[in-house]
């Protein structure tokens, strides 16, 4: 026996889970994803990674602009799904959708719930300097990531791990976890535990303001911020490159020894003074350019020790 599944997801993170469900023998009766969006230099419409995979599998794809209203609910119920699997879909599911599948809606969430409920759990965990995070399979409720948890896989966050590194580590783990959860659900053996009332922290969307590096902060905190925002959207500073202040992303860095006025470039290797200690820039990306080693960037733009970065 296999389950009839509606899959709902959009970005790369959701792709391995869809592939695992199809490979596991379940019948994916529909795939919901966000509509194609402009991308690339030509801003041509590009389907989401989930849509691209679904079409390769020959699965029916829906890209509704809303799931609210009786028509959307009726369309969803008409799929006759036993369960819905939701992975980074990017749209709120109203009660009429949540209540439609007899076995409920399962969500794969990239954190150890209830810590980091919300939109940016991977980035927030790294930015906060957390030593571990994980992936969880939960049953969805109307509240934001408040549902009971069935399965959890923990992962250590190493001191130099970026959000991109962690994202790539959690993707296959999450896919395997959901595969096991569906197997248990099929056998009637999937049990759910309510989330603790204590320890709730929300992973709000990243703002442009917090992506800018504040050199008056301690170097350790800035290091975590660089890791948590790499590769996207990228922590950044401003430097005068001859045409006024230009944005430069910092993709990799590490804490270093050094002192001086915050934001001062201390050497040719890319060490910048912070409120406490210093930050060594390792890899950067100037606006509109490819990523490069920080020392090469400084040498090419003739940014010498004593230069102030904003």
From Swiss-Prot:
Its EC number is 2.1.2.9. GO terms for molecular function: methionyl-tRNA formyltransferase activity. GO terms for cellular component: cytosol. (6S)-5,6,7,8-tetrahydrofolate binds at residues 111-114. It comes from the Bacteria. Keywords: Protein biosynthesis, Transferase. It catalyses: L-methionyl-tRNA(fMet) + (6R)-10-formyltetrahydrofolate = N-formyl-L-methionyl-tRNA(fMet) + (6S)-5,6,7,8-tetrahydrofolate + H(+). Disulfide bonds: none annotated. Belongs to the Fmt family. Attaches a formyl group to the free amino group of methionyl-tRNA(fMet). The formyl group appears to play a dual role in the initiator identity of N-formylmethionyl-tRNA by promoting its recognition by IF2 and preventing the misappropriation of this tRNA by the elongation apparatus. NCBIfam families: fmt. This is Methionyl-tRNA formyltransferase. The lineage of its organism: Bacteria, Pseudomonadati, Pseudomonadota, Alphaproteobacteria, Hyphomicrobiales.
